[in-house]
Amino acid sequence: MKKKKINSNNLLLLITIVLFFVMYAAGCIVYADKGFTRFQTFLNILINNAGLICITAGMTCVMLTGGIDISVGSLVAMDCMILAVGIEQWGWSSPVLMLLILAIGIVFGIVQGFCISYLEIQPFIVTMAGMFFARGMTAVICKEQVSIVSDKIFTTLSSFKISLPFGGYLNKKGIMQFPYLRVTVVVALIVILAIYLMLKYTRFGRSIYAVGGNQQSATL
């Protein structure tokens, strides 16, 4: 019988998953008396990293083309600062600011994509310039001040809990508590599903794989 060889990409994924569960198991052993073994602890990892999940899902598409984008973190910081300052200092409405930062992100990506695809500048150089620009604009907008968002829409969304009908436990007061998710996790899961379907079932998704494999062949 022929032995099946493990693909290097699958091996890296397997190692990552194993390390994750090893660290989680270590946390369960060390902090067992502090409720670390509860299912909610695992869900908190998703809750705390929902934004990062959305970003990495988009970055996956970039990496599949063989490119790189190091401006993402600075762009997110700039958009968040515009949102916070716009609500607390400029007095703009939340829906308008949400549309504004989405538009800024789209325009930012189009400009960088144009420089990379048509001007044929290396992605690392273009996105590094974008990173410094976004980081500088963030400092200019915030003026070295911290803005705490107190808008009702955001406070409601951030405090809203989606209770799960399993994994409950009794707290110190003897009240049954069930694990929960936040809205951000649902959004992250929708983003992952949308990108998966796009990559697997659309012409654009197949083009991304083709460009990453061989750009000249994909052009033909």
PLM segments and residue spans:
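Single transmembrane alpha-helix segments in multi-pass membrane proteins
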Residues: 24-29, 38-90, 114-121, 217
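Transmembrane helix-bundle core of multi-pass membrane transporters
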Residues: 7, 123-202
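Membrane-embedded alpha-helical core segments of multi-pass
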Residues: 50, 54-58, 78-82, 104-111, ...
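Membrane-interfacial amphipathic/re-entrant helices at transmembrane-helix boundaries
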Residues: 1-56, 90-96, 173-176
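Hydrophobic alpha-helical transmembrane segments
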Residues: 10-18, 45, 53, 74-78, ...
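Transmembrane helix-loop junctions in multipass membrane proteins, especially transporters and channels
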Residues: 28-36, 89-92, 117-121, 143-151, ...
